[in-house]
Amino acid sequence: MSESVQEAKSALSKIRNIGITAHIDAGKTTTTERILYYTGVSHKIGEVHEGNTTTDYMAQERERGITITSAAVTCEWNDHRINIIDTPGHIDFNIEVNRSLRVLDGAIFVIEGVAGVQPQSETNWRLADRYNVPRIIFINKLDRTGADFYYAFSTLKEKLDIVAVPLQLPIGAEENFIGVVDLVEMRAIVWEGGELGAKFHYEEIPDDLKEKAAEARQTLLDTALAMDDAAMEEYFEKGDVDVAILKKCIKKGAISGEFRPVMCGTAFKNKGVQPLLDAVIDYLPAPDEVEGIRIAPPEGEEVDEDFLPIVPVDPDGKFAGLAFKIISDKYGTLTFVRVYRGVLNSGDTILNTTKGHKERVGRMFQMHADKRQEVKSVGAGDIAAFVGLKDTVTGDTLADAADPVVLERMQFPVPVIDISVEPKTKDAVEKMTLALQKLTAEDPSLHLKTDQETGQTILSGMGELHLDIIVDRLRREYGVDANIGAPQVAYRETITKPHVETYTHKKQSGGSGQFAEVKIEFAPSEKPDEIIFENKVVGGTVPKEYIPAVEKGIRMQSTTGVLAGFPTVDFKFTLLDGKYHDVDSSALAFEIAAKACFREGMKNAGPVILEPIMDVEITTPNDHVGDVVGDLNRRRGIIQNQETAGSTVMIRAQVPLKEMFGYISHLRSATKGRASFTMQFHHYDPVPRNVAEEIIAKSA
């Protein structure tokens, strides 16, 4: 191994790429701010309620006190570089969590000390499971009235179905919370007043916690040492184990997912953050300590992903990286890239292997939220922002042309709400179009289309807040004032039974005419969210060169369903037979025939309208439960379960999105502002007949 490669591998061991994620208001941005303060990135602690945080740098984020985008921040701790991504908690911005977890090696899950595990934490946890991201849990806000570490801890098993192992226990509760018991070193860590939590000291474990700490330490030893036979043997021989060995076992368990280490504190009151940083270094993996990334299966092929080759993180290989975020600002377009293999220098030309074209990297930056530090090269394990890429979007692979690997693709959620967007002046049409193109390039969960009948520009997103933010950005960042239509449900159409349709397209108007005949079977798809095409033509009744035109015609026509003009989804179409004419047939003729065949065939295949069904979770005081449940029933909701925690009740229901517009105002009014709710897309379901008739009549 060359000296330079050895140096690169050594440097790699000192990198941590982590995300901080949680339910909205659990304190993840506050936790990030404390980390930046203690690591010296910022010299003043920003506060969410004051609108001056480092990672929430967009105007809308500071006004609303929520995180909208994933801000990337680099900091140093104990001779290690930590790249942190602070992600949104609001479900409307789940795309940001998805793409961040996709490129990280570890994560801190911030859990609120009063409520415990909440819906968005569950959603994010499942996403992290999908990408096998090692995790540390930080139970936060233990200074709050009603905070209970042990209750919050119990929700980890109950709602996430995991083996959670505390590495700390709290000292004191609510306003008397002063520190933690460190179960690894078996000592108390107590924070001193003033100096924004920068000063703390170690002392003996308080007498009233010694028994509880001994029990928790035993649980930690039993669980962690099971990861290493030699460590377990040493423990049996000596009755204890060296701290370094115990830490190594905890790290092994955290990376494998056998158990999840749990820390605690209160970021807002500056207690518990430094040990959390130590835990990031001690227990979360360096880039080369995780499996790496799978290559993508060939386009259109079904392959068991367990058999796909893995690209390991390797500084000595040919360059390969994944673009996971695009930002347009006053300086141009920034493309955030996670590097998995090799080294790249500014000015190099690389291949976008997803699209098959070359890109030249102009400059590269390490980001500190909206501030940037230029770097001349990046290597395996790095996260950096590239300037100069012309045609690269989220999810594209960038690689050395000598080894044009395509990395595993990202999956993005389906938008469920539409609004129409029209500029207030004709002069602003082009300006608005360019702005919306930039915004949709940044955000793959945002879709843009033109209504074929009205000519209106339609913007589709994940929720009312999502679209509200986009409209606000149009005005602030791009100077476009627009008239916005009321939010509309993004309905879909599908079919419920198979049907075979034959259609002949014949046109003769002097000279050569047009002729094409197709026989197509339409059937419900066995795979959700997919339109599948199969060609079963034999004997050349439809020449091979015209087959793509048939597929193109059906896919184009499927954007306008036969019932109410909504996109048709979840169906399979099979070309069975057809006829052609030596002179009059053409690709265009077969495309036209396929479109007409779709229009006629779908009418006889049991078409139905689908509506988005949302998972709704409402937290309400006991005395309002009856009113809330009754109202949900009136909204066609189906109650899933109810859980009581003290004087509040958590109600889970599935409710059609159509019935949830404006719900927050109604809920506040009905409960005098004491209830709250979260909502996220769950699935599409056929609408009842009376609702379908209403929708069809409105679209006529």
UniProtKB/Swiss-Prot annotation:
One of its GO terms (biological process) is ribosome disassembly. Catalyzes the GTP-dependent ribosomal translocation step during translation elongation. During this step, the ribosome changes from the pre-translocational (PRE) to the post-translocational (POST) state as the newly formed A-site-bound peptidyl-tRNA and P-site-bound deacylated tRNA move to the P and E sites, respectively. Catalyzes the coordinated movement of the two tRNA molecules, the mRNA and conformational changes in the ribosome. Its main location: cytoplasm. The lineage of its organism: Bacteria, Pseudomonadati, Pseudomonadota, Alphaproteobacteria, Acetobacterales. One of its GO terms (molecular function) is GTP binding. Residues 13-288 form the tr-type G domain. It is found in: Cytoplasm. GO terms for cellular component: cytoplasm. Belongs to the TRAFAC class translation factor GTPase superfamily. Classic translation factor GTPase family. EF-G/EF-2 subfamily. This is Elongation factor G. Gene3D superfamilies: 3.30.230.10, 3.30.70.240, Elongation Factor G (Translational Gtpase), domain 3, P-loop containing nucleotide triphosphate hydrolases, Translation factors. It comes from Gluconobacter oxydans (strain 621H).
